[in-house]
Amino acid sequence: MTTGFLQKIFGSRNQRLVKQYQKTVAAINALETQIEKLTDDQLRGKTDEFRQRVAAGESLDKLLPEAFAVCREASRRVLKMRHFDVQLIGGMVLHYGKIAEMRTGEGKTLVATLPVYLNALSGRGVHVVTVNDYLAQRDAEWMARLYNFLGLSVGINLSGMEHDQKQQAYAADITYGTNNEFGFDYLRDNMVYETGARVQRALNFAVVDEVDSILIDEARTPLIISGQAEDHTELYVRMNALPPLLERQIGEEKADGTGVEKPGDYTLDEKSRQVFLTESGHEKAERLLAEWGLIGEGESLYAPQNITLMHHVYAALRAHTLFHKDQHYVVQNGEVVIVDEFTGRLMAGRRWSDGLHQAVEAKEHVKIQSENQTLASITFQNYFRMYAKLAGMTGTADTEAYEFNEIYGLETVVIPTNRPPKRIDKQDQIYKTAKERYDAVIRDIRDCYERGQPVLVGTTSIENSELLSHLLKQAGLPHEVLNAKQHEREAAIVAEAGRPRAITIATNMAGRGTDIVLGGNVEKQAAFIEADESIPADEKARRIQQLHDEWESLHEQVKAAGGLHIIGTERHESRRIDNQLRGRAGRQGDPGSSRFYLSLDDPLLRIFAGDRVRAIMDRLKMPEGEAIEAGIVTRSIESAQRKVEARNFDIRKQLLEYDDVANDQRKVIYQQRNELLEAHDITETITAMRHSVIADVVRQFVPEGSIEEQWDVPELEEALRNDWQLDLAIQEMVNESSSITADEILDAVTTAADEQYEAKVALVGRESFSAFERSVMLQTVDRLWREHLAALDHLRQGIHLRGYAQKNPKQEYKREAFELFAAMLEAIKQEVTRIVMNVQIQSPEQLEEAAEQIEERSSHLENVEYQHAEFAEAGAPAAGGAAVAAATATADMVGSAMAHSGPGGEMPKVGRNDPCPCGSGKKYKHCHGKLS
């Protein structure tokens, strides 16, 4: 109450910011007359003047009014578009590293030119991030005319580009590209073997278009570069036979033994999209697997040797019960292609991780592709937080303002519209069944069609869009379907969607980024005519002129009919996605309307609010086909959406907290890697490693401060001879001197190792040997880092079970991840020293050949895939690996062992400094290694 009273007097934080920016707008407008008088060359010359002032120490903030005024004038001359005052405010919000929420049609693409131009003056590069290649190319080509006029270079960073093209794109003042490509380039840059092979510069300033889609919707899915791992194709095929033989349990058993309506073998948790075997399910699965010869008679699925089988059991169960064809994926050309649940687009080339994709392939009887090993990964949260300054723009950010601030430190500012909005948002209508809902939707569409009003119908899945299309065909209503299957025709369909009587069905936000203009998009239609080579030039000109002549009357006709009408056939779990659909209508002060039609069968209502609403309908004895249309019900649905949003926020935040652990380690490894690449000579590093490793070896047999009776000299001599190629007569030294100490023995061994090393260097020359050492070091770091990532994945999958032991899973994960990381660093020292000490080189040519082979083996990765894969939710079993973690007793062992398992999964000999396989968390030499 007090807050509301104060807001009335002082205005909200948003209003105060906008008011503050309006003062700067006045300063920009005051410069307009002066800037207008400049010639094109003088206007272009302003860029060089600004650059010199920035180089001399003037801040970009001080330069802002002049730079914005110059950019606006250049836009007026080149693009024939002058920035409105509210667009100048939007530009300022972006420059100050905030998120600008601007309604659809308010010109976000044009707004971005202001802060992009200003920040490009520093010469450190600006990245403009979009959601797909089409928008990146469209915006870059469209705005390049403006930037080039002002003397700035523009690059486009698209997937599949050649290495040289990428380097040129990043070297430009302004680089347009997709979020995925920027992230993958960062990962690839940290896998190169020469500094000249990198493409990115330091991350300076990024403007993220559709920031909610990139930083919120896609934040649960890390970018993963992976290569093929061991083949388990046969196992997926055999495991695919299991789910149909298991039955779902309805209801959950309570403490008093009640609650189960129908006993079964597994339970589904639709909210967290997880599946769990019941006790009877475990017994049945074990019996069936024993019959098929996959486990021994009477063996438990939780036995350590069956851990991987549990992984396959749960992957198959999730594939059959939680992932449905034409909703979560489609089958195209014999391949399973994921459907983005937020945009409805096909995500070709992306694969679910952890064996889930292979399980779905087995279910659909298509060719099963090999499982992948993670080579490098990063989340969008951690990638975008590396930019010195980050800003974003979208039509719908206010509902997620708290998350933007909490995770990224980005404040959201709602920018006023240029003209007052006229869209009418009608109350939701709720029906008992899906059939009644679709009948009402068809009635509404028919009414609009007869009145000449264009309609955009939003659906949440490809399946629903095709069902509605079928119903419209039966009703004799002509329409277009815009979903992932019609991706290529997307721009053409959207261009026509604002014409009178146009009916367009769109999956979620397919077509986002392209305005629906009332009366049709003349520019788009003209572009299609221009691109058609079969039409003669004079005919093209006539048709384009005809389009312009017709558009005015069509525009007025649609406005008179009420503008674009939006129909939502289902509420999404996020209010923001619903608002995005509504936002397609009423652009730039145009009329428009929207309404959602729901049924009690919809997942959101069924899971969160169905029983309550159904009880109201039953009490009111509502006849079939009658709808509830009441504010209390709409508020109830919005309350359910808020709960889901809060839960999804917690998941993303928890994911970030877990990934922050890996991120700290990633930074250390990448920093060390970069130092290695840039160093001319790493002799000091190699020497320090060798001394540390030799000390560990000697101390194992001749402990520090011990007496001669405790020494095992013959074993030390054998270890040095076999593992390090050092043939030393230590026993003779001991026999000759009764007063020799453990430290003197260590000094003697270290000196011998140094002499052997120097002899190898002398044979081939310092420069050649240093290059070889660098190759060995990089290859070892990369290989052990990959194995460490696999270890972290396995550790993460089982860590939630620590909660049952009254331990904090997050703290346990941090502790064990640190232990694994320390063990990995120790293993790097051991491995590098072993290779350098054991290498037998006779000539510089042999050395170069060995270095080339090492580099080739590491850098030439066959069958590399770039995934934006579903990441396991923190605190819940991971995708497809729910039970990898179920063996609490072996979780430590699996996590530790995986860090050092070879590519084929075989366990090598345990090193002294490796974590002990017993799971104690101690080093082997301080645990069971001491006993042996």
Curated annotation (Swiss-Prot):
EC numbers, comma separated: 7.4.2.8
Name of the protein described by the UniProt record: Protein translocase subunit SecA
Give the SUPFAM superfamilies listed for this entry. Answer: Helical scaffold and wing domains of SecA, P-loop containing nucleoside triphosphate hydrolases, Pre-protein crosslinking domain of SecA
Q: Which gene encodes it?
A: secA
Q: Which InterPro entries match?
A: Helicase_ATP-bd (IPR014001), Helicase_C-like (IPR001650), P-loop_NTPase (IPR027417), SEC_C_motif (IPR004027), SecA (IPR000185), SecA_CS (IPR020937), SecA_DEAD (IPR011115), SecA_motor_DEAD (IPR014018)
Report membrane topology: Peripheral membrane protein
Against CDD domains, the record matches this protein to: DEXDc_SecA (cd17928), SF2_C_secA (cd18803)
- What functional role does this protein have? Part of the Sec protein translocase complex. Interacts with the SecYEG preprotein conducting channel. Has a central role in coupling the hydrolysis of ATP to the transfer of proteins into and across the cell membrane, serving both as a receptor for the preprotein-SecB complex and as an ATP-driven molecular motor driving the stepwise translocation of polypeptide chains across the membrane.
The species this protein belongs to is: Burkholderia multivorans (strain ATCC 17616 / 249)
Q: List locations, semicolon-separated.
A: Cell inner membrane; Cytoplasm
According to its UniProt record, which protein family does this protein belong to? Belongs to the SecA family.
The residues listed in the UniProt record as binding ATP, with positions renumbered to this chain, are 87, 105-109, 515
Annotated GO biological processes are: intracellular protein transmembrane transport; protein import; protein targeting; protein transport by the Sec complex
Q: Does the keyword DNA damage apply?
A: no
One Pfam family of this chain: SecA_DEAD
* PROSITE patterns, A to Z: SECA (PS01312), SECA_MOTOR_DEAD (PS51196)
One annotated Gene Ontology cellular component of this protein: cytosol
What is this enzyme's class at the first EC digit?
translocase
